[in-house]
């Protein structure tokens, strides 16, 4: 069993090493970080969504921004579309599950906001529909995905594609990327910045 545990830890290291060496992905993480910093300086918000583990990641990232990531500072506006069960079930019942996020974006999203859709496959229909709604409202779209990026990577203004086919490794990498972005936002707006 110990050997298996070590193999899993090693696999986690390996995908992070791949990300570390992927200059294109590093540049895109920097691009999204800069977009978010500019967004917050302009009084806008990030909106996030995902399904299953990706829903948990959306909530986690939003909580780091609204609460705090590394130090005490004013709250940063961020919203996960996965938290309101009444809204999710009403929209799911009346419009279908494929529209649970797009309908919320129609009501709460504003031009200049950023929508971050999270999916390990990049093919979640409800996130794809949310991208369509976001584009109509002038909301910048970011895909945080894995595998080949799927349809979401093709549709997004910026696609952060974790180069792996393993759902657990993709999810681990998504939260790493989310944490890096939160850290940069916090330090750029309320700290001494990042080199």
UniProtKB/Swiss-Prot annotation:
It catalyses: 2 D-sedoheptulose 7-phosphate = D-glycero-alpha-D-manno-heptose 7-phosphate + D-glycero-beta-D-manno-heptose 7-phosphate. GO terms for biological process: carbohydrate metabolic process; D-glycero-D-manno-heptose 7-phosphate biosynthetic process. Residues 35-195 form the SIS domain. It is found in: Cytoplasm. Its EC number is 5.3.1.28. Substrate binds at residues 51-53, 64, 93-94, 119-121, 124, 171. GO terms for cellular component: cytoplasm. Keywords: Carbohydrate metabolism, Cytoplasm, Isomerase, Metal-binding, Zinc. PROSITE patterns: SIS. Homotetramer. Belongs to the SIS family. GmhA subfamily. PANTHER family: DNAA INITIATOR-ASSOCIATING PROTEIN DIAA, SEDOHEPTULOSE 7-PHOSPHATE ISOMERASE / DNAA INITIATOR-ASSOCIATING FACTOR FOR REPLICATION INITIATION. HAMAP family: GmhA. The reaction produces a racemic mixture of D-glycero-alpha-D-manno-heptose 7-phosphate and D-glycero-beta-D-manno-heptose 7-phosphate. This is Phosphoheptose isomerase. It comes from Sulfurimonas denitrificans (strain ATCC 33889 / DSM 1251) (Thiomicrospira denitrificans (strain ATCC 33889 / DSM 1251)). The gene is gmhA.
């Amino acid at each position: 069993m110990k050997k298996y545990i070590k193999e899993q830890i090693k696999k986690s290291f390996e995908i992070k090493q791949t990300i570390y060496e992927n200059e294109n992905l590093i540049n895109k993480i920097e691009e999204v970080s800069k977009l978010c910093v500019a967004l917050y300086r302009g009084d806008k918000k990030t909106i996030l969504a995902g399904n299953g583990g990706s829903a948990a990641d959306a909530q986690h990232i939003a909580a780091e921004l609204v609460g705090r990531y590394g130090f005490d500072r004013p709250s940063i506006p961020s919203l996960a579309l996965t938290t309101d069960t009444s809204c999710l079930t009403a929209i799911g019942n009346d419009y279908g599950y494929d529209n649970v996020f797009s309908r919320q974006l129609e009501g709460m999203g504003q031009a200049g906001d950023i929508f971050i859709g999270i999916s390990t496959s990049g093919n979640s229909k409800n996130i794809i529909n949310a991208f369509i709604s976001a584009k109509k409202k002038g909301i910048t779209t970011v895909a945080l995905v894995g595998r080949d990026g799927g349809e979401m990577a093709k549709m997004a203004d910026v696609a952060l594609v974790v180069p792996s086919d393993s759902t657990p490794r993709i999810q681990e990498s998504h939260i790493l990327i989310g944490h890096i972005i939160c850290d940069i936002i916090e330090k750029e707006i309320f700290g001494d910045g990042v080199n």
